[in-house]
Amino acid sequence: MLAKHGRIIVLEDDIEVAPFFLRYMNSALDFYENRGVFSISGYTPELVMPRDYQFSTYVMHRNCSWGWGTWAQEWDKVDWEVKSFDSFIRNARQRSAFNECGNDLTPFLLRWKKGAREMWDIVFCYAGFVHGRPTVYPRKSLVRNAGTDGTGSHAFADAKKYSSPLAANVSLSAFVPGVAPNQELLKQFHDFYSTSTLRLIYNTLMRWRYILFGK
């Protein structure tokens, strides 16, 4: 698909979409191609937009696989073996930068390294980080994951947190042109995805276990 068309739009079977989802995705793929963007997301958590924020999209250094698209040249940047992992996991500065959009990201990558190979999207996310290329998000969500209630492959204990209402409309002429995250939105985004203190302690112990014992 990517080799033939140069781009792809992906939906899992438990994703509900707004009627104009495909129009948005194709327009965004056209607009952001060759602009330093890694992927396009159809989902967004509910964020409070700054009063002076006039755009219909925003960017973050974290991808989302709930209805998304990318280009062949970005997909080809991914190192699916994550050969830099052992140096990354020992580098506090790199971990902090990767966790800019949620302190759950490094633990997800560690879980992948330890065998959870179905978590391919964290490898894609890490590649975007390595290459400094963000994901574009809509102002309001254009997809809803119906599988977070336990019926899908990946269930969530706090499913309601991720259930954003579908947008009633979307502007295709107000895409944010830059690729630097808005700092107010970044703070909200980080807080939305970050874990509890107890989970943070557990994740830290798991990281040190890997560093010291390789498991």
Regions found by a protein language model. Give the residues of each.
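An acidic/histidine-cluster motif and surrounding catalytic segment
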Residues: 1-10, 15-215
